[in-house]
Structure formats: C-alpha cells, structure tokens
Curated annotation (Swiss-Prot):
Name of protein: DNA ligase 2
Binding site for NAD(+): 45-49, 94-95, 125, 148, 185, 301, 325
Catalytic site positions: 127
GO biological process, one term: DNA replication
A Gene Ontology molecular function term of the record: metal ion binding
Biased composition (Low complexity): 725-743
C-alpha cells in the first residue's frame, strides 16, 4: 500500500516541480563528484549548501520526492567503486577476425550473397586497442558505465568512468532518446604510459605491461580519485539497446553521436566495394601511427542497419561485421640480457637482448632502453618475460615486464663503469647529466665505427653502398691487423688496393655484435670488398665513386658529417648559410657563433670545443688536401633572395617531385624553418600522399595547406601567391566518427 500511496502522491506533484527537483538532484550529485573525486569543484561551499537547502525545501513541501536515492538522504563523502555485476540490456558481441585477404574476400562474398542486393555499403573503422565499455544514458543522463565482461554481464564502473573528461554526464541537443546504450573503447595514450610506469616503480608498485593493461587497471581502481589522475580517453563506436531512436545507416548514427557530445573519431570511411575496403586497410597499415591512439586493425561493417538485421548474428559475433587484424606490434618474449652500446658521440646506451620474436612482420632480437634511469623506471629485470613493441619503422622498445610470470631467478641490471669496446672509464659529460659517455673519442673503435657510418649516411655525405658493414670493416677489421680508416681523415684517400684484403665480422646495426649463421650458429665473417677471384666487388667500386662524388657536397652536409655534438642537419644548414666556409666558422668567436640565427650558446660552445682538438683540425686539413669543398660558392652578397625568411613550414606525406630531404633543403635555402609538428605559428603545411594527422591538425588550426602545385608556387613565387593556391579549409571540422575495438 505504501508504494501505491507514493505513486498517488507523486502524480499530484506538478510536472515543473518534479523537473526542478530532478535537475537540482543531478546538479548536487555532480558537485559532490567533482569535490570528492576530481578535486575540481566549480561552485563555492555556500552555493552548494544553497542548492542542497533548495532541494530539502522541495522535499519538505512534497514528501513523495524524498526517495532513498535523493542527495538529501545520502551521506556525502568519498566515492568507492564496488564493481557489482550488471546486465547489459543488449549483448555486447565479439567480432570474427580476418588475417589475410582471402578471409576478408570470403566474408564480403557471404555478405553480398546473404543481403541479396548489390546496393550496400561498408563502413571502415579503426580498431582501437583498449578496453570495451558500455555507457547507459536515460533521458540524456549518464546513469551507468560497465565493462563488457562476458558480453551479457559486466562490472559497474560508473564512478571511475565519470572521471574521464571526454565522456559527457549529460547528452547535448534535442531529440535525445529515453534510453540508449553507447559502446566504446577506453584507452591509455602511449606517450603517457612510460611516465605512469615510472611513478609506479618509484612507489614500489607493479608496473603495467602495456597501455591496454594500464587502461584496464586504471578503470578497476576502487577509489575513483586514483582513476581521475590517469589520462584516460575514450572513443565510441556503436549503439546497443535504445528506445525512441530510428536510423537507417550506421554512419549516420555516428554523426548523431557526435552531435550529442560523445567522443567520436575522425578516420572512418564509407565505401561501396571490397576494393575500397582494401584501400582503407592498406592506407592505415602504412599510417597506423599517424592517429592519436593505438590501433591493431580495421573493423569493417555493413553500413545499412536494416540489412544488418537481415544477416543477424552467431552466438558470439555479428555476421555483418569483421575485424581485419594487422601483424601484432606488441608480443611477449624473454629478456635474455641487457647490454650497452656506444654511440658516435660516446654516449653509452643500454639495450635489451631478447629471445628472437616476430613483431610487426619482422624478427626482433634487440630493443632500445635509452639509459639506466629508463631501465629502472620500466622495472625490468634480466630474465623477465617482457612486452616488446615495434611501431612501424621505429626501433623496437620494451614496454614493461609481466610481473606475474617472475620465478625468482631474475636479476637487476648494473650499468658498467668502463667502455665495453675500449676499456676507458665512463663518466657524465657534466655533473647533472643522466647519460654516461666514453671520453676516448679518437681511438674508441665503437665511436669511430658509428661516426663513419653516420658520415656516409643520407643526412651527411650520402655515399652509395657505404653501409654499416662497410663502416665496421674499415674501422675494425680482422685482417689486416691495422684498420684502413684510423679516423675520418683517411676517408678521401681510400684506394681499391686497400679494400681488397679486408676481412671482418658482419655486424648487426642494432647491437654492434656479429651476426650469426642461422644454420651453424657461428659468427659471420666476410671478405667485404673482394669477390672469390680477388677482384673488387661492384659495391666496392660504387662506394669509392660515391666517396669521390662527396668531395663536392654542400658545406652543410660536410658539417653534419663531422659529428660535432648538437650540430645536426638544421644547425649545420644555418652555420653554412651564415658563415659560408669552414675557415670562417673556425675563426669565429663563440659569441659570434652564438649570435647567428638558429645557433645559440650551446651549439656555439660545442663547435669551439670541436675545433680545439688538434686531431679534428687534422681531419679538416686532410680533407681539404684531398679536394673536399669546404666552402659554399659565392659571398654573402651573392646569396640571393630569401623570401621565406622567418616562416615555419611543415612537410608531410610522400611528394612525387621531391624527396623529403630535398623539399626541406629547398625551403631552407629560401630562409624557411622546417618543423616536424603543426602549431598556430606554422605558416604553411605541404602535403603529399598519405599526409596523416598533420593535415588534420592544419585544417583544424586553419593553417594554409599546399599540395605539390602549391609547393612549387611557394618556392617560385613566394608566400603571398602560395596563400592564394592553398587548399580550401572547411568551415567546420568534419563530423567525427568513432573508433572500434571489435569487442
């Protein structure tokens, strides 16, 4: 009877009073949450008390509004996530996978056959590598968030999900359905992952093995205040149960989610054929690291919702969708050892030797660890099972250990005190430096090998057929006993007769260790430059021709190749432009160097320190005698116009008419600064094929974007005409589309 009385009493409360009560209750709950969980109150205590008293007054006047769920009946205090089991109104299904084109084509054929009409489309989405979450909105208000669980039942994580800034507590706009379940993926950005693990290790807590585990662990905190400190993000990619919502196309549904204020992604595409699907998959296979989160594949869905219903589902997955999986970029393997390598400037860097494993389509045996502090911050021990990641062309890296698999035999890494190749005691260059360095720059074989390899490389003299094996053979051969190159000064005096007798280990570029024969396990040794008849190999002849051609290299490339600390291609370009010859750079005071545009005191000091060494001067002397051009032609007055002086330009994508380096050099020659990221200070963004996220950022910031024709106008006619040729900027950002985890 009491329940019936309450219903009768509630029905007697005017609608506007009930609405005012509901709004006040929601606002008070939100203020409590911001105060106790996020430590970000947006109202004063007095304003909060005033709202609470208003709610109490309404309930005093209308007692039927005073329910156990009312803020007036609950004690305010710390929130706690209990992880109680909750049932999804509509099942969260998984997805079937396609690992090759044959499986993808077979699925597309089945779809075409079952829908019975050629008039259908595919919606291609990126597959986010995160944790699947189901959001329930009732009358536009977020009432529950739950994990996927077994698809039918998940865990209630509402207080934790409410800490994610991107997830609206109330949907925007009109025509909000009475009920809607929103499916999406919570992820942990890679750039924040290492920082979190370092904090955990410093606090003697277990580190996470990878960003996905970090996202899951962050959502499973009993105290939402902890979750609130984690930089979690979400993208939505589907709709579950709903009332009062009618829509025919999934792509249109995503546009609707965006208008409601939900975090959707921008990389989806509707195509009308399998060829379009393949093109989308290929594009993001090459550009998967240009998006703002980790992806491990592409989800392909039938876009027409009525046709989805016709195809139905199996017990675990819809027949109208499939997940194309890229080769995995994260795998588990054993950390066999931690070694150290010596770079061209003497920096000693730890690296991981792991049991060989296939990652992202290639075999990996070594991974970077940067420095001893990173080893400590990652919490890895020799003997650990670790998660290794290889992202595109990036050097493989260790993400973290799988702590639960430790058996007690693991041991900590200790940084060596002496150089592993020359035995010199290691020390930091300055007292506060993290890195240890080998100070034996002249005779340390590792430093010489790395400097010579860099000198011949694409950023420096760009000598054909002069790779890592050649650099190692010339600087530390097995035969003859003495190296042909004792330092860089010998480079331009090399002869074919010197090359022929050289035998050396075939070294691995990642580790500096000899490669091994896969059949015998023995270290590989080769006669590097001569064939079996004792005649010079074609690559040896080509290498000597490349060395001769490098004598005419621009001054900037010569400066880059000298491995002066802090002088990379950009600084070398500025030094060459402003001083014109190596003699004038040598003669300039530190103050004169520091005053030059783009140089500054750090580079200036490093340049003067380099020229203070007699053996460095000997390199310059012998190169000059060999005919190396040590000055750019012309005087300062002859330099020519610099119409792009002071402008910052970003180049992205593949240009048909220029290499990336060629485009940069053309811009720098006209005075432009070439940057790697887009900001409000960017003057132009030059885009080729597959430009990635920099194009999107430029459009968002309304930075002029030039295609190849526009780039030619910029170089030939200047910035004002180039602005006229810029690609049109949309009035508003394109409608966002969601990512998909393929639960």
């Amino acid at each position: 009877m009491a329940g019936e009385d309450r219903v009768e009493q509630e029905s007697s409360v005017p609608a506007d009073v009930r609405e005012k009560h509901a709004l006040l209750a929601e606002q008070i709950e939100e203020h409590r949450f911001r105060y106790y969980v996020k430590d970000q109150p947006v109202v004063s205590d007095a304003d909060f008390d005033r709202q609470l008293r208003s709610l109490e007054a309404l309930e005093e006047e209308h007692p039927s509004l005073r329910t156990p769920d009312s803020p007036t009946q609950k004690v305010a205090g710390p929130y706690r996530t209990e992880f109680t089991s909750v049932e999804h109104r509509e099942r969260m299904l998984s997805l079937d996978n396609a690992f090759d084109d044959e499986e993808l084509a077979a699925w597309a054929d089945r779809v075409a056959k079952d829908v019975g009409t050629p008039d259908h489309h595919f919606l291609c989405e990126l597959k986010v590598d995160g944790l699947a979450v189901n959001l329930t909105y009732e009358h536009g208000r977020l009432t529950r968030a739950a994990t996927r669980g077994d698809g039918r039942t998940g865990e209630d994580i509402t207080p934790n999900v409410r800490t994610i800034a991107e997830i609206p507590h109330r949907l925007k706009g009109e025509d909000i359905p009475a009920l809607v379940e929103i499916r999406g993926e919570v992820f942990f950005p890679m750039e924040d992952f290492e920082e979190l693990n370092a904090r955990l290790v410093a606090a003697d807590d277990k580190p996470f093995a990878n960003p996905r585990n970090a996202a899951a662990g962050s959502l499973r905190q009993k105290d939402p205040k902890v979750t609130a400190t984690r930089p979690l993000h979400m993208v939505v990619h589907g709709i579950g149960a709903h009332e009062g919502l009618s829509i025919d196309r999934l792509s249109a549904a995503y546009d609707l989610l965006h208008t409601w204020g939900l975090p959707t992604a921008r990389h989806n595409k509707v195509v009308d054929s399998l060829a379009g699907v393949r093109e989308f998959i290929a594009h993001y296979g090459e550009n998967r690291h240009s998006v703002e989160h980790e992806i491990d594949g592409v989800v392909v869905k039938l876009d027409e919702i009525p046709l989805q219903g016709r195809l139905g589902s199996t017990s675990r997955a819809p027949r109208w969708a499939i997940a194309w999986k890229y080769a995995p970029e994260e795998v588990n393997t054993k950390l066999v050892n931690i070694r150290v390598g010596v770079g061209r400037t003497g920096r000693v860097t730890p690296y991981a030797q792991v049991e060989p494993v296939e990652v992202a389509g290639s075999e990996v045996e070594f991974a970077t660890l940067h420095n001893q502090n990173v080893v400590k911050a990652k919490g890895v021990l020799i003997g650990d099972t670790v998660v290794i990641r290889k992202a595109g062309e990036v050097i493989p890296e260790i993400l973290g250990p799988v702590v639960d698999l430790r058996d007690g035999t693991e041991k900590a890494f200790e940084m060596p005190t002496h150089c592993p190749e020359c035995g010199t005691e290691l020390r930091p260059m300055k007292e506060a430096d993290i890195d240890l360095r080998c100070p034996n720059a002249r005779t340390c074989p590792a430093q010489l090998r790395e400097r010579v390899f860099y000198l011949a490389g694409r950023k420096s003299l760009d000598i054909d057929h002069f790779g890592y094996v050649a650099a190692a053979a010339l600087t530390r051969p097995l035969e003859p006993a003495e190296p042909v190159l004792k330092d860089e000064s010998d480079l331009f005096s090399l002869t074919v007769e010197q090359l022929l007798p050289i035998r050396a280990y075939v070294l691995d570029q990642d580790s500096g260790l000899p490669k091994r024969d896969p059949k015998t396990g023995e270290e590989k040794i080769a006669t590097v430059f001569a064939n079996q008849q004792g005649e010079p190999k074609k690559n040896a002849v080509a290498m000597l021709e490349g060395i001769a051609a490098a004598k005419d290299a621009p001054l900037a490339r010569v400066l880059t190749g000298l491995s002066i600390r802090h002088v990379g291609p950009v600084a070398a370009q500025e030094l060459a432009r402003q001083f014109r010859s190596i003699e004038r750079i040598d003669e300039a005071t530190e103050e004169e160097l520091a005053a030059a545009d783009g140089v500054g005191p750090t580079i200036a000091a490093s340049v003067k320190q380099w020229f203070a060494e007699d053996w460095h001067r000997e390199i310059v002397r012998k190169w000059r005698e060999a005919g190396v051009r040590m000055a750019d032609e012309g005087s300062d007055e002859d330099e020519g116009p610099r119409p792009l002086e002071g402008l910052t330009v970003v180049v992205t994508g593949t240009l048909a008419g220029h290499t990336r380096d060629g485009a940069k050099e053309a811009l720098q020659a006209l005075g432009a600064k070439v940057a790697g990221s887009v900001s409000k200070k960017t003057a132009f963004v030059v885009v080729g094929d597959n430009p990635g996220s920099k194009y999107d950022k430029a459009m968002q910031l309304k930075v002029p974007v030039l295609d190849e024709d526009g780039f030619a106008i910029l170089l030939e006619q200047g910035p004002e005409r180039a602005k006229e040729a810029a690609l049109p900027v949309p009035e508003a950002a394109p409608a966002a589309d969601p990512e998909n985890s393929g639960e």
